[in-house]
Amino acid sequence: MTMQVGRGEHFREGSWLERRIARLRGARTRPAPAALRRLHELMLDLLPGDHLVSTLPGGERVRVAARHRHLSWNPEEYAAFKSAVRPGATVLDVGANVGAYTVLFAQWAGAAGRVIAFEPSPETIAGLREHVRINAVADRVEIVDAAVSSGEGTASFDCAGASGANALVAADGGIADGVITVRTTSLDRFCESRGLRPSVIKIDVEGAELDVLRGARQTLAQPGLDIFVEFHPSIWAARGITRDEIASELERQGLHPQPLHPSLDVWNTEGISVRLLKN
């Protein structure tokens, strides 16, 4: 479960509409239907002021667009990522969503650093661009509107807005409402074409971990690279993959997963990354 470690702070006193929304949300015991969630987002757009500020344990201040006030940071991930991303680092944020960590990576890497954020969902990219803009890190963040997979081409992608559940659709998953065609690339192909040697890679791709790993064998073999990946075992079966396949791919690459907290089982934990270490 992701725990919020940031402290939300408004630039202005909440309006009557915001307070009313908060009371209504607090009274609900079931997840809101999509239409109601969308109405809530539109109402937030009408509020005075366009963002909030979260202050994290290290003193970082992250401006958050009002409609994305749900953003949170896991304390173990926050600490591990901060330790890995040093000034001047080149960071690949694979599955950046609306940029909760993209913005932090950019702050930590500094003006001499570089963050490349991959995100294929048009709606989510809009939130990502907004957070890059209002946090004044556009000079060091490049947004790539593509899904990272095992190779170049196109794929079906299930858009779930900015909920964090956006995902590539399995080959036999069929086509449904909300599914679009997106461009795909692999980390190996992308890095080779740009002459990139990343310092840190964060992967959070909602069940597509195996394809990303397969398409990154050369990149992940580079020395001195910090690698983090979030596993999604609850949806592997729906994507037609197994734990054994992922374990086999990691073994082939000479990697093994290590939890960010000693109490966690790397194969049965979601909502937090694991670190991939060289054998």
Write out the residue ranges for each language-model feature.
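S-adenosyl-L-methionine
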Residues: T2-H131, A136-R140, G174, C191-R194, ...
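Short internal loop-to-helix segment that lines adenine-nucleotide cofactor pockets
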Residues: H70-L92, R140-E142, T154-S156, V169-P223, ...
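Short, glycine/acidic-enriched loop or turn micro-motifs at the edges of active sites
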Residues: A96-V98, P122, V148-S150, V205-G207, ...
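Alpha-helical elements of the RecA-like P-loop NTPase motor core of helicases
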Residues: V103, I125-A126, N166, L210-R214
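A short, conserved beta-to-alpha structural element at the edge of catalytic cores
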Residues: P120-E123, G224-A238
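Core alpha/beta nucleotide-donor-binding catalytic domains of modification enzymes
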Residues: P122-I125, R129-A165
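Conserved beta-strand termini and adjacent loop/short-helix elements that scaffold enzyme active sites
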Residues: V144-A146, T185, E230, L260-P262
